[in-house]
Amino acid sequence: MAAVSVFQPPVGGFSFDNCRRNAVLEADFAKKGFKLPKARKTGTTIAGVVYKDGIVLGADTRATEGMVVADKNCSKIHFISPNIYCCGAGTAADTDMTTQLISSNLELHSLTTGRLPRVVTANRMLKQMLFRYQGYIGAALVLGGVDVTGPHLYSIYPHGSTDKLPYVTMGSGSLAAMAVFEDKFRPDMEEEEAKKLVSEAIAAGIFNDLGSGSNIDLCVISKSKLDFLRPFSVPNKKGTRLGRYRCEKGTTAVLTEKVTPLEIEVLEETVQTMDTS
C-alpha cells in the first residue's frame, strides 16, 4: 500500500513569514498599553592572545545592572579544566552556569577517556549547547588552553558560531581592545610581552567603554605552568581626599534671624494606661 508522504522539502533562503505576525502582535500590545522587551545592554571587555609557549586571557572586573555598577571586582575568567580557562561576557548568570556545566561534562569526558581534555573538545561542547538554545543563552565566550597539540584560542558567540584566531576580543569594549591587538600583535611573542599586550587591550576597553571598568585580571596558560593574576593591574584607582571639606561652626555669618512660634490646638486627647501586672 502506497503511503502518502507529508514531508515537505526545505526551501532555500531566509523566511520572513513571522515578520508580519510580529508586527501584528506589536500593534496589539501597543493598543493594550504593553511594550515589547528591549535588548539588555551588558558591559564587558574580554580578550585573549596566543604567544610562543601558550595562551594569555584577560578580562575587566566590572559587573553592571542597567546603568548601575553592581560589582566592582567580579571574576570573569572561569575554570573549565586544569589546562583550559574561559572568559565570559554577556549575562552573568548565563556565563557562570554555562561554564560550570561544560566544566563538569569535560571532567566526565576526561575520566572516561583517561586523558587530559583538549581545547577543541570544550569548544565543540560549548558551541553545540549554545546553538541548541538559538542565542537565548546570552554567553559570549573566549576559550583558551594548551593541550597535547599546542595552544588554542577560540571566540564563541551566543548563537553557537566560533572562530579560531591568534588574538580575539569579545564584549562591549571589544572594538577598543581589537584596535590595540591590530596595532601591536606579532607572532611568537614572549610571555611578558603578551601579558603587557593583553593588559593594554583590556585597559583600552575600560577607558573607552562605560560598561567596562575597575581592575584587569590575567590568566597565563602554558604546558609547564598556570598563573592566575588577580588583579594584574588597577588602572582605575580611587582618588584620595586631599583635605577636610567641613566648615567650622560660625564660619558663615547669620545676617537675620526670625523665630515663629508654632501654635497647636489639641482637639482630642486619649490616655492609655500600661498593664504592669
From Swiss-Prot:
The active site is at 44 (nucleophile). Induction: Up-regulated by the antioxidant dithiolethione (D3T) in colon (at protein level). It is found in: Cytoplasm; Nucleus. One of its GO terms (molecular function) is threonine-type endopeptidase activity. Keywords: Cytoplasm, Hydrolase, Nucleus, Protease, Proteasome, Threonine protease, Zymogen. Component of the 20S core proteasome complex involved in the proteolytic degradation of most intracellular proteins. This complex plays numerous essential roles within the cell by associating with different regulatory particles. Associated with two 19S regulatory particles, forms the 26S proteasome and thus participates in the ATP-dependent degradation of ubiquitinated proteins. This is Proteasome subunit beta type-7. The lineage of its organism: Eukaryota, Metazoa, Chordata, Craniata, Vertebrata.
